[in-house]
């Protein structure tokens, strides 16, 4: 397993969050079937996820940097 920032595969951006620490949105996104993590929380205004499978992409994506085309 690995830890990392969740990443939007279509934009290459992190999942933004504003409620730091325990965060329902991040936890839900982290545990979603397509991510497969064990616990998510908000760190530095982005969703950090623990216990991700190695197959799940995390920020930064190799071919996409957020905000650049």
Curated annotation (Swiss-Prot):
One of its GO terms (biological process) is defense response. It is found in: Secreted. GO terms for molecular function: sodium channel inhibitor activity; toxin activity. InterPro entries: LCN-type_CS_alpha_beta_dom (IPR044062), Scorpion_toxin-like (IPR003614), Scorpion_toxin-like_sf (IPR036574), Scorpion_toxinL (IPR018218), Scorpion_toxinL/defensin (IPR002061). The modification Cysteine amide is found at residue 66. The keyword Repressor does not apply. Residues 67-69 form a propeptide. Residues 2-67 form the LCN-type CS-alpha/beta domain. It comes from the Eukaryota. Disulfide bonds join 13-66, 17-42, 26-47, 30-49. Residues 1 form the signal peptide. CDD domains: neurotoxins_LC_scorpion. Keywords: Amidation, Disulfide bond, Ion channel impairing toxin, Neurotoxin, Secreted, Signal, Toxin, Voltage-gated sodium channel impairing toxin. One of its GO terms (cellular component) is extracellular region. SUPFAM superfamilies: Scorpion toxin-like. Expressed by the venom gland. Gene3D superfamilies: Knottin, scorpion toxin-like. Belongs to the long (4 C-C) scorpion toxin superfamily. Sodium channel inhibitor family. Beta subfamily. Has the structural arrangement of an alpha-helix connected to antiparallel beta-sheets by disulfide bonds (CS-alpha/beta). Beta toxins bind voltage-independently at site-4 of sodium channels (Nav) and shift the voltage of activation toward more negative potentials thereby affecting sodium channel activation and promoting spontaneous and repetitive firing. This is Neurotoxin Cex3. It comes from Centruroides exilicauda (Bark scorpion).
């Amino acid at each position: 397993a690995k830890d990392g920032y969740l990443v939007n595969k279509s934009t290459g951006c992190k999942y933004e969050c504003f409620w730091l620490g325990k965060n329902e949105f991040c936890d839900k996104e982290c545990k979603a079937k397509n991510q497969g993590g064990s616990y998510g929380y908000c760190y530095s205004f982005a969703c950090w996820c623990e216990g991700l499978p190695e197959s799940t992409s995390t920020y930064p994506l190799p071919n996409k940097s957020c905000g650049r085309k």
